From Swiss-Prot:
Localization per Swiss-Prot or TrEMBL: Cytoplasm, Cytosol
Cysteine disulfide partners in this protein: none
Name of this protein: RAB7A-interacting MON1-CCZ1 complex subunit 1
Gene name tied to this protein: Rimoc1
InterPro entries named in the record: RIMC1
Superkingdom of source: Eukaryota
Modified residues (N-acetylalanine): 2
UniProt cross-references to PANTHER family, sorted A to Z: RAB7A-INTERACTING MON1-CCZ1 COMPLEX SUBUNIT 1, UPF0600 PROTEIN C5ORF51
Length: 294
């Protein structure tokens, strides 16, 4: 057990040093202090101090959580820059790949550590959800930008297809980390709408947004990638080298999109009706799916 803990601590420390060097580079390039970079750097400094203690006494879960929070802040700064610049065509593919790799490291390390029975669950469900959400949302924003570039689409719709599949998989992964709450006589809820949401696996507004994002990405896939060999896209979902899957999967854009958007509309017009979520776009996409089916 001690050897396993020491191994995790060493690996987290190495990753933390790499991230700190990257933050230094970003700060120098920006030429000004940024709140997210400052917070990320502070977390990594604390991580470094904790890793300097006796490794056998360190809590690997706390260390990995600190590292994860730093990565989330650091990559958020870079994502905002890409969005503000509308994903420049020359550098965005490599930059998105780097960001996905950073956001995948905590999950990869947690999975490797889970091979040791006493190191299971190093990252809680909420952090794992956040990592998947951030990767899926990044690819959503990137694909949204790409769908507005007609010449690029004519040349590289196969790349869009791969980006979409990876993004959808990340969002579906995020939605499936926690099981829906089973409602029974032993569980009491003062708010019936909250109970309905939890029973469908919707735990936050981000879960609702993830459903809309994944449905919209399925729409883009069906609209822009129909010149591919089949509407059932069997692709290598390890597009950027740090995907949530490392094998070939079949993803039917229409089937997946229809299922997730029907749930989105049901939730928004049911338990979330008072919050006035917009369902017009979702219904238009569902109509598009029906036309493609007939």
């Amino acid at each position: 057990m001690a050897a396993a803990v020491s191994g995790v601590v060493r690996r987290v420390e190495e990753l933390g040093d790499l991230a700190q060097a990257h933050i230094q580079h970003l700060s120098e390039a920006a030429g000004e202090d940024d709140h997210f970079l400052i917070r990320a750097s502070a977390a990594l400094e604390k991580l470094k101090l904790l890793c300097g203690e006796e490794k056998e006494c360190s809590n690997p879960s706390n260390l990995l959580e600190l590292y994860t929070q730093a990565i989330l802040d650091m990559t958020y700064f870079e994502e905002n820059k890409l969005v503000d610049e509308d994903f420049p065509e020359d550098c965005s593919p490599q930059k998105v790949k780097e960001l996905l790799a950073f956001l995948s490291e905590p999950e990869i390390l947690a999975k490797e550590s889970n091979m040791h029975p006493k190191l299971c669950g190093l990252l809680g469900a909420e952090l794992l959800e956040c990592l998947s959400w951030r990767r899926g949302a990044l690819l959503y924003m990137y694909c949204h930008s790409l769908t507005k570039r007609r010449e690029w689409l004519l040349r590289k719709s196969n790349l869009l297809q791969k980006y979409l599949v990876d993004g959808i998989n990340y969002l579906l992964q995020m939605l499936n980390y926690r099981c829906p709450v089973q409602l029974n006589e032993g569980v009491s809820f003062q708010d019936l709408d909250t109970a309905k949401l939890l029973s469908t696996g919707v735990f936050s507004d981000i879960h609702v947004l993830a459903m809309m994002y994944s449905g919209e990405m399925c729409y883009w896939g069906l609209k822009h990638c129909t010149d591919q060999q089949s509407e059932n896209h069997e692709v290598d979902t390890d597009v950027f080298g740090a995907s949530c899957t490392t094998h070939k999967e079949t993803l039917d854009f229409r089937e997946v999109g229809e299922k997730i958007l029907k749930k989105y509309v049901s939730v928004c017009e049911g338990p979330l009706k008072e919050q006035e979520w917009n369902t017009a776009n979702a219904k238009q996409i569902l109509s598009f799916f029906q036309q493609r089916c007939s």
